[in-house]
Amino acid sequence: MFGIGFQELLVVLVLVLLVFGANKLPEIGGGLGRAIRNFKRAASEPDEIDVTPTDKKDKNDDKQA
């Protein structure tokens, strides 16, 4: 798919292990999982539309005064 083979994936995993350490990996994985879940939820929810009525007459009266 991305042209990343098993060897490249293994090298990346070893580098992440060296940089962050074994104790931080579950924490990083959990944070990444939450981020992906929130992104999917935000992408699937419809956009919120503000339907609050505004009184245009009052605004025009304020401008004339």
Curated annotation (Swiss-Prot):
Any one GO molecular-function label of the UniProt entry: protein transmembrane transporter activity
Key words, A-Z: Cell inner membrane, Cell membrane, Membrane, Protein transport, Translocation, Transmembrane, Transmembrane helix, Transport
GO BP annotations listed: protein transport by the Tat complex
A Pfam family recorded for this sequence: TatA_B_E
Membrane topology: Single-pass membrane protein
Any single GO CC term annotated in Swiss-Prot or TrEMBL for this entry: TAT protein transport complex
Location in the cell: Cell inner membrane
Membrane-crossing segments per the record: 1-21
Residues spanning the signal sequence: none
Function comment: Part of the twin-arginine translocation (Tat) system that transports large folded proteins containing a characteristic twin-arginine motif in their signal peptide across membranes. TatA could form the protein-conducting channel of the Tat system.
Family matches, as NCBIfam families: tatAE
Record's subunit section: The Tat system comprises two distinct complexes: a TatABC complex, containing multiple copies of TatA, TatB and TatC subunits, and a separate TatA complex, containing only TatA subunits. Substrates initially bind to the TatABC complex, which probably triggers association of the separate TatA complex to form the active translocon.
UniProt similarity note: Belongs to the TatA/E family.
Protein name: Sec-independent protein translocase protein TatA
Organism: Nitratidesulfovibrio vulgaris (strain ATCC 29579 / DSM 644 / CCUG 34227 / NCIMB 8303 / VKM B-1760 / Hildenborough) (Desulfovibrio vulgaris)
